[in-house]
Amino acid sequence: MAITRWFFSTNHKDIGTLYLVFGAWAGMVGTALSLLIRAELNQPGALLGDDQIYNVIVTAHAFVMIFFMVMPILIGGFGNWLVPLMIGAPHMAFPRMNNMSFWLLPPSFLLLLASSGVEAGAGTGWTVYPPLAGNLAHAGASVDLTIFSLHLAGVSSILGAINFITTTINMKPPALSQYQTPLFVWAVLITAVLLLLSLPVLAAGITMLLTDRNLNTTFFDPAGGGDPILYQHLFWFFGHPEVYILILPGFGIISHVVAYYAGKKEPFGYMGMVWAMMAIGLLGFIVWAHHMFTVGMDVDTRAYFTSATMIIAIPTGVKVFSWLATLHGGTIKWDTPMLWALGFIFLFTVGGLTGIVLSNSSLDIVLHDTYYVVAHFHYVLSMGAVFAIMAGFVHWFPLFTGFSLHDTWTKIHFGVMFIGVNLTFFPQHFLGLAGMPRRYSDYPDAYTLWNTVSSIGSLISLVAVIIFLFILWEAFASKRQVMSVELTMTNVEWLHGCPPPYHTFEEPAFVQVRSN
């Protein structure tokens, strides 16, 4: 196995594997950072000794989990592996650009780690708001390195997005209409469009911040006629679509897993599912200022952003009820991926409900920057995106490797993880309602109980991560071959066996469309 196979690969399966391995590794780093946060907050008083270090850890935790764990795994890993197989394409539209998209990520990660190592690190929060991110509050190269890291990750995602859009539209067999492609393909396509439209705005915002810091421009400095609120608008115009970028591929995975383990040929309401994802993608761009209810916007502006945000709950509800309808009347197989998918549906819905609470601008004035917000987005990310990743991984692991995971251990892993994340994040709702603010390393002792509970939960989640590593080792050590796969006619990615040959669909796929 020559090293060139991995460095110079143009094979969508190899690049998908690279993304999965990189994402898993980054996930370990992000988990370690989150445990440092929970260790600091386990009891009142200082552990790390310095608020700047604490904020650097919080910032790095967010960036690592978002840009180097969730996105590479969901879009780069599952997307690269499955999209060509699902539409019958021999490879991605731009195979060498695909390779570059991946290899931009390790240098980007390196720059992010470097930013923590120089000066005092970037303790700005993942939003990197000026004036805290300006050259007075953050003198030195830390924030600049973080900005360059984001630029690289952004370029990687934009190139990947171009590739996925071109592939899904252009590389299908002529007889296959876009409305006959699987839902995961749709999810990745819509995600790619969101990336393509939102990332350039982030690039503009952080480039302006870079020049404010180094070239004496005043885009965000009132002294020169600038406005720090402009940065917030630019950042959140990217930042809100970004959270839908993180969850949409997860929606696609859950649709596949639920239909498969309910024994159904297709998910309930295919067209409704597609339109719901389109609606979520569109609405995601016109609600960004709900992150800014406390900056002093007009009451009519707040009213608009409140109602627009609530509208997103409608297509999201369409998806949740369609998943439940897919389950209805099916012969349910209680395999591990199904457990993850059911956990996803329940916990994502809980996270969505707290989101509806926060969409009310009047309530958000009180809850903004408290742990209620932290609890909300960790329910949709730590139990939405991560549960979707686990569902997809356990479901498609036999396809990726040709080996099967240990049934009992994966169920134990699910149980431990389920308890861990809920114990970690459910108490944070109480802390938020009691007024505990985010991004502080210490707190009044009235908040001790729920912080301690939360930190114990994080240790349980750590045990789950270690169990997962053991499960991976066990699967590769035992080498249990995959016997047979059911429902291959409606799950075309499995048609070539486990694992599929290095090159699939070298000759164009023959597609017959049955109208029934």
UniProtKB/Swiss-Prot annotation:
UniProt-annotated binding residues for Fe(II)-heme a: H61, H378
UniProt binding sites for heme a3: H376
Cofactor note: Binds 2 heme A groups non-covalently per subunit. Binds a copper B center.
Residues reported to bind Na(+): E40, G45, S441
Primary location recorded for the protein, binned into one broad class: mitochondrion
Bilayer-crossing regions: 12-40, 51-86, 95-117, 141-170, 183-212, 228-261, 270-286, 299-327, 336-357, 371-400, 407-433, 447-478
GO CC terms: mitochondrial inner membrane; respiratory chain complex IV
Binding site for Cu cation: H240, H290, H291
CDD domains (alphabetical): Cyt_c_Oxidase_I
Protein's UniProt name: Cytochrome c oxidase subunit 1
Source organism of the structure: Formosania lacustris
